[in-house]
Amino acid sequence: ERIQAVLALLGRGRLLRRGVFLADGNALALSEPLLPLLELVRAHFPGEPVMGFLDLFTGLKKAPSWWERLGGMGLRRVYIGLETGHAPLLALLRKPGHPKEVLPLVRALKAAGLSVGVILMVGAGGKAFAEAHFRESLALLAELPLGRGDVVYLSPFREDPGTPYAALGLAPLEDLEGELQRWAQAVRRL
């Protein structure tokens, strides 16, 4: 029923869509409950590529065979919210683990034949972290086995008032658009 409702909502606009994005914040972390969902997607959207989001630290708990299985069910791309390659900034953002932990995850995804979308938050940490965030994120990207079909997303970070992050009082970047351009140029050179 839910899929029929979505199809009705999209109407002819569905023809503009290329693939199915599992829009839960961490859909690929579901493990076994994900399998019937992928079967439904395959039945209602035959041949359409499936994409989903995964946080880095949940993905580390999955065996390479899991990713191969999902690839066989239509999964084509996994988006990873890496956020930064700078460990102190990752800790400040209250994310567990170390940025380098993305290396074995991306290797496993690539070995399973999946493409990867790496998401970095440009501007996170403000002025205090800008250079280390830039330098270490690019160095980590250079270590990843990315290739054709993979994507690096540079997401502009904007502070929301009243959040724990805002309470830190970090001075934001003065020119976020300029910083995004700097990152984009550097990523293209990798």
Please report, for each region that a protein language model flagged, where it lies by residue:
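Flexible, glycine- and charge-enriched loops at secondary-structure boundaries
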Residues: 1, 95-99, 127-134, 169-177
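Acidic (Asp/Glu)-rich catalytic clusters
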Residues: 10-14, 41-45, 67-75, 107-111, ...
